[in-house]
């Protein structure tokens, strides 16, 4: 067996298929682009859907890739098995209507067994085939596979619902008897069974049927090949590792974690090993996901990241790691993967910052979960129950990241159990929902043959002219290719067009189609790219049109000019934000409309208004400097040497377009722009807000729209000035400050009066000392307007040393509040935190605190008297 690193194995696979005429597709972002059916890119073929569905025609029908992927449907198994991962790499080769079974099988065999490539022992390889797929069986035998190494398996048919489907062939590597975990006569002890000896390394799907909506299967007009080889599994074979984790993809992370732990070592303890594996796996997924623009949040991709971070932190605690540590693993991931993913190491400072921020928040999450758990326990006791329902335990786990083990421990302290069977049932329901969703989604789509074979060229000339004469070459109406239309909606292609097709955040051009006599025959409502890249115009037809005829195409120049100004301003804003906030700020999305622009960017925390003003001022400064705006088309490497900024989430062709505004900004862009920044006139930010964890959104206007916005605000200021009875706008701020000072003084007077009233009322309570067992107790309810006043009363009680224990309650804004204080000489016997936990269920709430002072909040103010009684009863039971 050759000794190869993971980087060498990945490159060898890609080089092999490159030698077979394949184009190497770069690994796409984990965040799917234009595919709402996927939360994450979860396989190599997921990035090829646009080719297999006919939405886009690839330049080369032979493709290969090493695609980073994320799956979280079996997250509970990560760390417990040899090969479950959240993040993994899928090596694959693909044929879009080109070669088929014979070539795919022959090349697979060559890669695996040739001494020039993997060089594996042929006797260690086994293949499974679909029983009816005699072509695949014959192809394997033709390359020299022994018949007893080819196994027919009924499940070898790839089908995920409507769309391409077909038989598949799986390849297994025999790791030897030393890896066998089953008895010789076990029915699963065979290649394809559930065992550790025969390791599946490759699956080749022969996509030859279309699964129709009516459940039938029809032969595809173009047969495809889709394969997937898990890099981590292959590396474990080359490096003779018992599991995927003992390879160079994971061990540096495990070793770093061990160094951060309380003297723990991988391999010394099975339970600790699970934690080491979980942390290593999750650190990889977290790093790559954040690097691709996803951020921790409460839903969707953000929730997945948050859940992985929480799970890793809990496992770090099991290893004795105190405080934040995951951020220290981010650069380790970058170093491991830098050969193929250099951007991860380049972004490691930013990624680590995001991770550290989320780690620091984890304590808040635990607190929220604890409050919910206290409420559940209080409700149970009130109803006479003694078991937390499985659904509630699952909610704590799934929504708050509350480990079920912690729920069980905490509930046990209160004499409550957890319905483990119910919890596991809810877990299974979640898995079933995920599995059903995968089965039902139309992941590959039906092949669209209407435009896929239309290769009539259509030249875009809109960079230099906004009107042209052109021939109508393709016409679609009613989902059919037609040669003429008279009215209604239609799609059209022209041999030349000045209309921009929506792309890169810029909306499509609008305008009219005129006949040779100058009469309008159609309005252009939208423009999108067809499968072969042509501009496809959506028309509202008002007069007859026919293919082959010549028409005048005229772009709405007023709308187009507004879009140009907003698009160039977007690039100026992007650069200005990086100047003000730092290079960690990245574009997270944009929309360039005619009447406004929208720009999303990564930034943690609130945006300081002063910094936002700096960015706005910088954009306007560059507008007033009258910078020339130039564009150039060049190859991607030359563009990068020019310093052009590219988005990691975008894919670029061999030739790219670069836009520059003086020396201030140079970025990849295929959109329309002004010739000089002075054409923008004015730039004004109209709003800034958060749209997700770590993502901020700016909306802005330019030119006449910016003037109109400022004019409207002037009118508002004038109206406010009139209400405040000031004659000059610049006097408004001074007047408002004076009013605020007056309000603050009144509030202070009110607080002083309320404090005096509370003290008077508390005086009556403080005068009434009772005996509860061995302790002197003062308890009762008072009227206050906020919790701070309760704490102030506790301070008064402590200063006067009025009793051993104080318990006060109050209703504030419809909620119940409790405070418990214990004198210094009694804190060894009685702790305020213990007492508050005992009585807070009476108000349907929970709380905690220090031995000398604790507080709680709840939803049931009517329970405050019961809480006072419970406090006395609890104290009476203490020694």
Curated annotation (Swiss-Prot):
Highest taxon listed in the record's lineage: Bacteria
Co-factor: note: Binds 1 zinc ion per subunit.
EC nos: 6.1.1.7
Keywords: Aminoacyl-tRNA synthetase, ATP-binding, Cytoplasm, Ligase, Metal-binding, Nucleotide-binding, Protein biosynthesis, RNA-binding, tRNA-binding, Zinc
InterPro entries given in the database record: aa-tRNA-synth_II/BPL/LPL (IPR045864), Ala-tRNA-lgiase_IIc (IPR002318), Ala-tRNA-ligase_IIc_anticod-bd (IPR018162), Ala-tRNA-synth_IIc_core (IPR018165), Ala-tRNA-synth_IIc_N (IPR018164), Ala-tRNA_ligase (IPR050058), Ala_tRNA_ligase_euk/bac (IPR023033), DHHA1_dom (IPR003156)
Cofactor needs: Zn(2+)
Family label: Belongs to the class-II aminoacyl-tRNA synthetase family.
Name of this chain's protein: Alanine--tRNA ligase
Gene name of the encoded protein: alaS
